[in-house]
Amino acid sequence: LIPRPDTEVLATKLIDAARSAGPCRILDLCAGSGCIGLAAAANLPNARVLLGEYDEEALKICRQNIRRNRLTSRVASLGLDAREKPSRSLGEFNFLVSNPPYIPSGDIASLDVSVREHEPRLALDGGEDGLDFYRAICEKWRDALAPEGMLFFEVGIGQADQVLRIMRTNGFGDIQIVKDLNNIPRVVYGTLCE
């Protein structure tokens, strides 16, 4: 998926939160090209970052981008499915960030041709209501977060309140909604409480 300007808000919020944490581990899940995790690594010299991506072609791009940005000493990539419970061998992360597929399946045919024809469906399709990945990540990946770890999501138009509820139901608190440059609620983040 080609990074969009909206994603800058997500990366900035993550970097701001992690900057005060000192040495930390960050997981960029549904990493796509890896732009969010790589931006974090470039701005946070004490961070170790894992780019987790399901699609093999996107994973190749992640690896190329790690090398191009000369971040091989602090950034790794791994094939991970956000819909499946992670292996305990991954360890714990202080921050989990994700810009998952969030377009409702029925809306994909009506997307602008520049998106519909040039982006992999796998990177767009969030299930019937567009929220499948948010549910899966909150339910299955919360154990990959350290105590008081933080979860950051980019969300689609009109999804922020629903994602907030999903997070709250799964033990996250101090949940914030942040608007993008067009004044649209675009980022939802919170802290693991239990």
Give the location of each predicted region:
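Glycine/small-residue-rich loop that forms an oxyanion/phosphate-binding "nest" at active or ligand-binding sites
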Residues: I2
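Conserved SAM/SAH cofactor-binding pocket of Class I
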Residues: D6-S110
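Class I S-adenosylmethionine-dependent transferase superfamily signal
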Residues: L14, A40, V115, I137, ...
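Conserved functional loop/turn residues at catalytic and ligand-binding sites
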Residues: E53, R70, E119, G149, ...
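C-terminal beta-strand of the catalytic ATP-binding
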Residues: Y102, T191-E194
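Mobile active-site "lid"/loop adjacent to the S-adenosyl-L-methionine
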Residues: Y102-D132
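Conserved Class I SAM-dependent methyltransferase catalytic core
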Residues: E128-T191
